[in-house]
Amino acid sequence: MKKKMRLKVLLASTATALLLLSGCQSNQTDQTVATYSGGKVTESSLYKELKQSPTTKTMLANMLIYRALNHAYGKSVSTKTVNDAYDSYKQQYGENFDAFLSQNGFSRSSFKESLRTNFLSEVALKKLKKVSESQLKAAWKTYQPKVTVQHILTSDEDTAKQVISDLAAGKDFAMLAKTDSIDTATKDNGGKISFELNNKTLDATFKDAAYKLKNGDYTQTPVKVTDGYEVIKMINHPAKGTFTSSKKALTASVYAKWSRDSSIMQRVISQVLKNQHVTIKDKDLADALDSYKKLATTN
């Protein structure tokens, strides 16, 4: 099923240009960027203009956040991890991948950087904020174990209803997935996926419907999701187990919940910036990180 886009757009290219132009000024050079009849645009004038843009401070903040995270935790996130995530999106969207990037404001390189930023942020969260025993016990109350299902994603409700009728008539789920599912990432393996309740890429309606199923059962009505309609069959719904045996999964569940909490993640980022002694030298851009600095003083 299609992954929901939750990545921050890092407009690093413009921010990079801003810093490069700033560096040129510090070297007391003022190269010509462009000419026109009667004049020219110099690096210093372009730099001054860029600083007036309302988005420049945001772009600079994003760039500094990425660099601070990468300096602090870069060794914890491998290139393979980023590439695997990138390839997963690429496979999922197929020939529509470039359109997906464009719609979300990414180039291929900036998309990889955003993926890396997400991974780095998760590492920072785990390093700087620990899960307590009481938080684990609270998570245990609503915890559900990892399940494995088959699913068929259709673009319209009528097709999903026909799939359910075909299943009732005894047709094979895996064969129907291959012929009727529009999810190119799973249709050829019978529509099989495994996930936990804290999975961030699946629709809540999908997860809610799946966890209500017993082994061998399938949804009797189409499940409405962001990308269409789902028919879901439960393959393996294990017992909940014990609190002690589930601590690792519970910890992952708490961190997944925290990673979706913008206030928590902002505090984590503010601490990273503080630990990395990030300072903006240009007085016109000096308040670009003020929202994070205020959080750091209350941590």
Curated annotation (Swiss-Prot):
Gene3D superfamilies: 3.10.50.40. This is Foldase protein PrsA. This protein is essential for production of active forms of the serine proteinase located in or secreted from the cell envelope. A lipid is attached at residue 24 (N-palmitoyl cysteine). It is an enzyme of class 5 (isomerase). It comes from the Bacteria. Residues 1-23 form the signal peptide. Keywords: Cell membrane, Isomerase, Lipoprotein, Membrane, Palmitate, Plasmid, Rotamase, Signal. GO terms for cellular component: plasma membrane. Residues 144-236 form the PpiC domain. A lipid is attached at residue 24 (S-diacylglycerol cysteine). It catalyses: [protein]-peptidylproline (omega=180) = [protein]-peptidylproline (omega=0). It is found in: Cell membrane. The keyword Isomerase applies. GO terms for biological process: protein folding. Transmembrane segments: none annotated. Belongs to the PrsA family. Its EC number is 5.2.1.8. It is a lipid-anchor. GO terms for molecular function: peptidyl-prolyl cis-trans isomerase activity.
